[in-house]
From Swiss-Prot:
Coiled coil: none annotated. Its main location: cytoplasm. The active site is at residues 119, 215. GO terms for cellular component: cytoplasm. This is tRNA-specific 2-thiouridylase MnmA. CDD domains: MnmA_TRMU-like. ATP binds at residues 24-31, 50, 143.
Length: 370
């Protein structure tokens, strides 16, 4: 059966039995299959699972999470049944600082965060790659649905074959230096293939559901953020674009740009959240046309391929976005760029990522400022 599931060699100049591969295991089906597949192909697999949160008992009970409690046990159980070593590293303090606190502070700036990108950018890639080097391993392998294509020494990050599972949006902050050591063996398969492989390898987690939403949010977003930043639930005013008071809100944590439901305002036309003014603790609302825009400013740029001035690309403005045609332009501000969409787009949210593609290839991107 394994002949149906061929993958690119992890390294061109070494045989599998000569290659030590660190596999980041979350306890889910994807990373477990990646580890089992490589082990069966003869690679020296070492499984590593990060304990990221949940030792206080608050976060690890939610179904569909990862990297805590049951998931760590599942990863260890897979390693034992397949027959490769497995280690658990406690990264709770780093995760709290780099991801959870950033999540809360981003909300407090009136933005909508994507903690999964920050986690990949810092804990999972930056820190795990250092672990990979410290252990004298050749590569770091993950179960992400994304493809790494290498030709003539040039490495490209591309969308997964399975577009419904593609995770390239969440990996835009990966650097060329990191890609030298990273490998994504599942990018050329469909999720249904991975389920088949899980059963073929007799993995106990073959029917385990996919992880959903943000792993450390055990309750609602608002309740989680309220615990991290109590000031986010202070009452304030809801005003229109001219400053007229229309009502009162119970905390900015309950709102995000583009939101319509839950405003609690009776008005002669539908109103949407236009902006969250954290300085005045105000939620600014207005008609839908105010939320339609073409020009986007992005910061903290990461280019896997440096775009030329006015380069035509397709951009994704949220993970579920199919993509919009746009051009990329330089600005006078350091480490910022301007993206001009061909057509108006509704509800562009500061704090989200703007990821640029050239066909299937990820060019790079940045965080939306405005």
């Amino acid at each position: 059966m394994l002949k149906e599931f061929e993958i690119e060699p992890l390294l061109k100049d070494k045989a599998p039995h000569q290659i030590k591969a660190i596999v980041a295991m979350s306890g889910g089906v994807d990373s477990s299959v990646a580890a089992a597949l490589l082990h069966n192909l003869g690679y020296q697999v070492i499984g590593v699972t990060l304990q990221l949160y949940g030792t206080d008992g608050n976060a690890n009970a939610r179904k569909g999470a990862c990297c805590a409690g049951q998931d760590i046990y599942d990863a260890k159980r897979v390693a034992e049944s397949v027959g490769f070593p497995h280690y658990i590293l406690n990264y709770e303090e780093i995760f709290k600082k780099e991801v959870i606190e950033d999540f809360a502070s981003t909300y407090m700036r009136g933005e909508t965060p994507i903690p999964c990108v920050r986690c990949n950018q810092t804990v999972k890639f930056r820190d795990l790659l250092q672990v990979t080097k410290n252990l004298g391993a050749d590569v770091l392998v993950t179960g992400h649905y994304v493809r790494r294509l290498e030709k003539n020494g040039e490495v490209k990050l591309c969308r997964s074959i399975d577009k419904s599972k593609d995770q390239s949006y969440f990996l835009f902050a990966t650097t060329q230096e990191q890609l030298k050591l990273l490998r994504f063996p599942l990018g050329g398969f469909y999720k249904s293939d991975i389920r088949k492989l899980a059963k073929y390898f007799s993995l106990q987690i073959s029917e385990k559901p996919d992880s959903q939403d943000i792993c450390f949010v055990s309750e609602s977003y608002s309740k989680t953020i309220a615990k991290l930043a109590p000031q986010s639930v202070q009452k304030g005013k809801i005003v229109d674009v001219n400053g007229k008071v229309l009502g009162e809100h119970s905390g900015i944590v309950n709102f995000t740009v583009g939101q319509r439901k839950g405003l609690g305002i009776a008005h002669n036309e539908p109103l949407y959240v236009i902006k969250i003014n954290t300085e005045n603790n105000e939620v600014i609302v207005g008609p839908i046309n105010v939320l339609m825009q073409k020009k986007i400013l992005i910061k903290e740029l990461n280019w896997l391929e440096q775009p030329k001035e006015g380069m035509e690309v397709t951009v994704k403005l949220r993970s579920s976005h199919a993509g919009s045609l746009a051009t990329i332009h330089s600005t006078d501000e350091k480490n910022k760029a301007c993206v001009i969409l061909n057509d108006d787009y509704f509800g562009i949210s500061p704090g989200q990522a703007c990821v640029a593609y050239k066909g299937e290839q990820v060019i790079g991107g940045g965080w939306i400022c405005s």
